Amino acid sequence: MAHKKGVGSSRNGRDSNPKYLGVKLFGGQAIEAGNIIIRQRGTQFHAGDGVGLGRDHTLFALVNGTVEFSIKGPKKRRTVNVIPA
């Protein structure tokens, strides 16, 4: 007959790695083509003029210029543009 009690396993003890999401360059800042403006999950911000949308919804500059944020349309969508330098 065993004299040790059965030991239960903990349901905790794991954590995901940080994803470093968020706005990387703010309005009025200079940017070069290819630089990341925002890393996001889903389209919290939408791509405007001079901005590309990556596979993981990352927004990046297509041209050199200045970052500009705006709110457009009846749905009040937050849009990011790059004004060419």
From Swiss-Prot:
A Gene Ontology cellular-component term: cytosolic large ribosomal subunit
Source taxon at top rank: Bacteria
PROSITE patterns: RIBOSOMAL_L27
Keyword Ribosomal protein listed: yes
InterPro entries: Ribosomal_bL27, Ribosomal_bL27_CS
SUPFAM superfamilies xref list: Ribosomal L27 protein-like (SSF110324)
Pfam families: Ribosomal_L27
GO terms (BP aspect): translation
Keyword set, alphabetical order: Ribonucleoprotein, Ribosomal protein
Gene Ontology molecular function: any one: structural constituent of ribosome
Entries under Gene3D superfamilies matching the protein: 2.40.50.100
NCBIfam families named among the record's database cross-references: L27
Record family assignment: Belongs to the bacterial ribosomal protein bL27 family.
Protein's UniProt name: Large ribosomal subunit protein bL27
Species for this entry: Xylella fastidiosa (strain Temecula1 / ATCC 700964)
